Amino acid sequence: MFSEPVKRIYDSQGAYYFQSSEAIRRLEGAIVKYTDLVESRDVADLELSGVVGGVVKVLDRLDQLVSETPPIPGPRRYGNMACRDWHEKIEREIPGLLEDLISSHFPSELQCVVELRYYLANSFGSATRLDFGTGHELSFLATVAALDMLGASFDGDQVLYIFDRYYSLVHRLILSYTLEPAGSHGVWGLDDHFHLAYILGSSQWCNRKKLAMEPNDLSDPVLVEQYSRTNIFCKTLNFVFTVKSGAFREHSPMLFDISRSVRTWAKVRKGLWKMYKDEVLNKFPVIQHFWFGTGFYPWVDYKNGKPLPNYENSPDIDETNDLKTQAQANMDGTRVVESRFLSPGNETFVRRPQLPQDSGVGTMRSSTPESRLMNVTTRSTRSTAGPGQGRMGPPTSMGIVQTRMPSSTTSQAHASRLMNTPRQ
């Protein structure tokens, strides 16, 4: 049931189909579950054992490899080339590390390593671009959620410990190898590298009987540093204060605005979650690097389990992030481009019409983000409007070849562990 993950998202059409996938349902379900589990908790020392101990052992080994791979001396503007050596080392070691972890705790699921190794290896930035961003952070979430689907059943303290250890390692990677932001919006983005960390950290402050820190205290670097050891929001913001100079309002205006305009942590969490769905899960530049297997994150419709449309643009096509841009290049508003539709064991070339300028498919923002509730059981509320009925309308008919995929009954059983685990 497990298979080598493959690329399915090649343009914003693929990003549109991703919104209907079982994969995004599981990822969103994991975020909702973990934000609930960590609510009102601090990062605390744990007696490491079981799956948690195994995960931390893997992260410790990857951290040790950083020590064994020092940065190359000399000024570097776009990342240190030693990072590529580090990535080569982890590519060699991760399969064995995961086999030890899975064989110790889930021996009957050893075949899952073929998928799990992809998500873990992609959790630490790009060896090609020497950068790190929210897509890599998403890959680590996918790794943790995959272990949860196998039966790890993490509680809130364990979730916090694992993510805190992960962020410590990533902070070291960014500083050691001067990793660039991946797809950053600059000062107009939430953060150069992270987003999920702020959701988890804000949830830690929610519903406390005695609140040690209010949102308006975020502009106090001394207080932020004080709580950076127990709160992931403060840990991440303290990292920002470490790597950036100047006024808070100038280098991180969005975080500064949160500290000035949002009064409660519950509202901070709600706003960050809504923003995450729009700016991470719904953005082609981010999710194009998320690949799909047949076990943990299958490329199938979450409603009926059928395979989603699957195609790849020809290499000679000038790919853009926005199909509307391509349409505007044509005098009549349409043109025909060549796409390769893929199915197992069969590749055919098909002519399809390019989307017209008014097709409504542009940057992939939901027309009704409020309807995308934080409960994964309500995913049927997603917009199914047709062309011209909102920005999330499906693209015009393209004669897409529907491919058949193997049944994933076991995969659904794994997913049910993730979705239905009660709050600890």
UniProtKB/Swiss-Prot annotation:
Disordered, as annotated region: 348-424
The protein, known as: Serine/threonine-protein phosphatase 2A activator 1
Principal subcellular localisation of the protein: cytoplasm
Enzymatic reactions: [protein]-peptidylproline (omega=180) = [protein]-peptidylproline (omega=0)
GO molecular function: peptidyl-prolyl cis-trans isomerase activity; protein tyrosine phosphatase activator activity
Gene3D superfamilies: 1.20.120.1150
Record's compositionally biased regions (Polar residues): 364-386, 404-424
Any one Gene Ontology cellular component term annotated for this protein: cytoplasm
Name of the gene: RRD1
Function in brief: PPIases accelerate the folding of proteins. It catalyzes the cis-trans isomerization of proline imidic peptide bonds in oligopeptides. Acts as a regulatory subunit for PP2A-like phosphatases modulating their activity or substrate specificity, probably by inducing a conformational change in the catalytic subunit, a direct target of the PPIase. Can reactivate inactive phosphatase PP2A-phosphatase methylesterase complexes (PP2Ai) in presence of ATP and Mg(2+) by dissociating the inactive form from the complex.
UniProt keyword annotation of Cell membrane present: no
Top enzyme class: isomerase
Subcellular location: Cytoplasm; Nucleus
A GO BP entry: mitotic spindle organization
PANTHER family noted in UniProt: SERINE/THREONINE-PROTEIN PHOSPHATASE 2A REGULATORY SUBUNIT B, SERINE_THREONINE-PROTEIN PHOSPHATASE 2A ACTIVATOR 1
UniProt entry keywords in alphabetical sequence: Cytoplasm, Isomerase, Nucleus, Rotamase
Family the entry assigns: Belongs to the PTPA-type PPIase family.
EC number: 5.2.1.8
Organism (species): Candida glabrata (strain ATCC 2001 / BCRC 20586 / JCM 3761 / NBRC 0622 / NRRL Y-65 / CBS 138) (Yeast)
